[in-house]
Amino acid sequence: MERKGGRQAELSVITKAKDLCSYILTVTEKSPKRFRFTLTSRIQNHALNIIENLYRANEVFLTKGDLSALDKRLEYQRQAMTECKLLSYMSLVAREQGAILPKQYEQITSKDYDVQNLLGAWIKSDDRRVKN
């Protein structure tokens, strides 16, 4: 994938994760103060950790048959997946406690689901590419 100027296009999973993070930062900014340093900061941290782990995974160069590189990339991908699941749970708690609105929760879970699906597809693709 190439863009103008010879720069590579970003992975769609990273783009979706950035959209998720941006939405979360916007939504949690308006959360009640009593949740700001507990639930909302943890939700924000999970969103940022997802992006961080995706970038780390993408920086691991894979070649056919290089199982050690695959393991390293897979570790970052799994960390990102775990962060997605934790984000989903924390968002549920935030909705139940009134830190975010039900519609905001729906948006977060929808965006999180997209990231998880794309991440799962990336993991499978890497596995096929390296092992075949």
What positions do the PLM features span?
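Amphipathic alpha-helical assembly/interaction segments
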Residues: 1-132
